[in-house]
Curated annotation (Swiss-Prot):
Domain ACT: 720-801, 827-904
Species this chain originates from: Pectobacterium atrosepticum (strain SCRI 1043 / ATCC BAA-672)
InterPro entries listed in its UniProt record: ACT-like_dom_sf (IPR045865), ACT_dom (IPR002912), HD/PDEase_dom (IPR003607), HD_domain (IPR006674), NT_sf (IPR043519), PII_UdlTrfase/GS_AdlTrfase (IPR013546), Polymerase_NTP_transf_dom (IPR002934), UTase/UR (IPR010043)
Lineage of origin: Bacteria, Pseudomonadati, Pseudomonadota, Gammaproteobacteria, Enterobacterales
Keyword Repeat included in the entry's annotation: yes
Domain of life: Bacteria
Gene: glnD
Domain HD: start-end pairs: 479-601
Region (Disordered): 1-23
Entry EC no(s): 2.7.7.59, 3.1.4.-
Protein task: Modifies, by uridylylation and deuridylylation, the PII regulatory proteins (GlnB and homologs), in response to the nitrogen status of the cell that GlnD senses through the glutamine level. Under low glutamine levels, catalyzes the conversion of the PII proteins and UTP to PII-UMP and PPi, while under higher glutamine levels, GlnD hydrolyzes PII-UMP to PII and UMP (deuridylylation). Thus, controls uridylylation state and activity of the PII proteins, and plays an important role in the regulation of nitrogen fixation and metabolism.
Sequence segments annotated as region (Uridylyl-removing): 361-719
Protein name in UniProt: Bifunctional uridylyltransferase/uridylyl-removing enzyme
GO molecular function: [protein-PII] uridylyltransferase activity; phosphoric diester hydrolase activity
Amino acid sequence: MTDKRFSPDNTPPDASSPDSPIDTIAAAQPPVSPLTYADDMLNCQALKQQLELFQLWLGSEFRSGVSAEKLIDARTLFIDRLLQRLWYCHGFENIAQTALVAVGGYGRGELHPLSDIDVLVLSQTELSDEHSQRVGQFITLLWDLKLEVGHSVRTLEECLQEGRADISVATNLIESRMICGDVALFLTLQKHVFSDEFWPSPTFFPAKITEQQERHQRYHSTSYNLEPDIKSSPGGLRDIHTLLWVARRHFGATSLNEMVGFGFLTEAERKELNECQSFLWRIRFALHLILPRYDNRLLFDRQLNVAQLLQYQGEGNTPVERMMKDFYRMTRRVSELNQMLLQLFDEAILALDASEKPRPIDDEFQLRGNLVDLRDENLFIKKPEAIMRMFYLMVRNRDISGIYSTTLRQLRHARRHLASPLCTIPEARQLFMNILRHPYAVSRALLPMHRHSVLWAYMPLWGNIVGQMQFDLFHAYTVDEHTIRVLLKLESFADEDTRPQHPLCVELYPRLPQPELLLLAALFHDIAKGRGGDHSELGALDVLEFAALHGLNSREAQLVSWLVRCHLLMSVTAQRRDIQDPTVIQQFATEVQSETRLRYLVSLTVADICATNETLWNSWKQSLLRELYFATEKQLRRGMQNTPDLRERVRHHRLQALALLRMDNIDEEALHHIWSRCRADYFLRHSPNQIAWHARHLLEHDTNKPLVLISHQASRGGTEIFIWSPDRPYLFAAVAGELDRRNLSVHDAQIFTSRDGMAMDTFIVLEPDGSPLAQDRHEMIRHALEQALTQRHYQHPRVRRTSPKLRHFSVPTEVNFLPTHTDRRSYMELSALDQPGLLARIGEIFSDLNLSLHGARISTIGERVEDLFILADSDRRALKPELRLKLQERLTEALNPNDKVPLS
């Protein structure tokens, strides 16, 4: 931004200047310049009123369509003049060799509605006590006016000393701007700051690069987090500031326009950066207008208000998704320009030895250091397929770490002038498939192709998902960023270092006959999101067209299409179906058809879960997928029509458990008395180790009294809690409510009742971070559950407070009964808004309707829960249609997201 406020002596323009933003911006009631305030207006109450009027005017002007740039200029000028008026009011003009200096964002002239006002009180020598007291009164008044003022009081020598020691202080001084006071003193500061002794460019530049890298790492090196920081996330305003800081220090350029004059920015690049900055300023300005205090994070609860203020249209979450798509696309452009221009600066500032010549690779490319460079700068325009040749070169040559800046500039130019997508060129298609077949296809080629929008240039379908967000708590990244992370995760399965986290996938991945087909499926698995309809079905059709264009045979095309169509199948089956039911395994195996397809699918499933949200993957999900994988593998080897003999499994489990117990020299007569009370389902659905663990403690316990056991070792990835208690109505609700109150999430429940009315319930629980129950909480949880079990009358459990994030989402309650192979059980799927005490409320309704619960599988997907419940009526039969309808009505009424959840 060109700073029009600078006059030759670095003082602000006069209030009556025709260039003054306050005067030129049309408004019903433009604010009065603070320079015109009478002395009797210079009190806290009157000034506060003027500031409030000014903020209201900013909002009104913005809503009427005035640009953020003009309003930012207006606020900067307004604050300049207010500080000048107060400076003179406090008598500072009578104090020799002092100056008031704007630093930081205020120095750049970038005051958004809630921006900090950072000032430096500069003096030649240390201030006297009287003058220091006067400065204190000046700053205190600004604080009393509720201005976010950051200040420092330093002598000239202190500024230089602290600036040399701290890059942040140095940066503030580099972008400092005179407000009022001793001009000669300020110019002396400027002379020192821009001298070769004060942070010379070869030192300043690497320090700012390191600072940027550390900042990017704090945001997971992506601007695609769904709650980005407009200022600090990669591709945000700070990345533009970094370019300006470096240019200011090295070239003395004070604006993007001047960078063009120095030859380090083309006119097109300046225009693009200005466009990006203007967009980011507009969003940041709108965000500040809706917030009570300074913050630059686009949190979920703010996004809809900002989108509406910016006049994005559409139903439901559409305005948010449209705004965020624009945001992510802008930050992509900033990131690419930032990378390219900093590399150009690097070459200018830290110039390599001129005698070091580029090393030829072939007729078209050469190496400059470890960066690939064009030998003919017009190659990409003349032969667009050479773009793909460059990336194929990058995947094969491990010495290449990136693209040289001038080549990147040519790539950007050629990309914008393509007559048709790259995939229409036969040689480009062959090169793309060659890239996919390489072991490092993702990290060395597909990732940089995505960063530089070449994937988009290759296949236009990819462009549809670039920046495509989903307004929920489940997906942590945009669709394109998520897809790239899936691909990177798949590539990591070829690395032995990944084995501790993903032992099954690392074992299976090398056995895939054509890993490139898995990468292709991953590339397309979410390609149809945001287009309406079933994205899995649409994507499966898209990839068939792609496969035909790229010469895949029928078998290869059908496999990739099936993987895209069924990429959610294994995740849904493992987490939301009863995978201990042989019929479920048989149905899943029928869909999978072969062990080879099973290996492809489990690899894609694990990568998809991990890349959706880092918090989703835990040992519980890992155990479910392993269990489903091995059960399906066994079914496929046994043959589709052969089902396991359940009676034989019951007998086997009893014998194995007995063998374990005999090692403890137990009373077998007492044991058989306990086991005679248990139904066959109990032995079928517990492992021999679990059965032995229960029996060992029951033999030492009065079996007419409640017993609570908590496993010390993780079982199936979570902590197992076993409850033995006289069965009674609302027992499940009481236990679930107590576990929820203790901030434990239930992921699985197996509910059994013995022949003589004892509940034998098993719960798998996890801490909020997905880890098993902390050892130091075992005794407290056990005691709390025992108390809940011994209460004579059921009491509604006290409920935790709702997470602030959940308040901004609405999930309609949906109840669906699955087709079943038995008349003894009903399988009910429930989808609802996650909320404290949810499982207890569901349990209460089951008891109200006299239903018996036999099992539950609990999945929390962001703000949504998707649960499976296995139910029977009072006659131990499947629910009749009228009872299903009644249950559906009760659940929908009770779990309506508009209902208020009681607070503790």
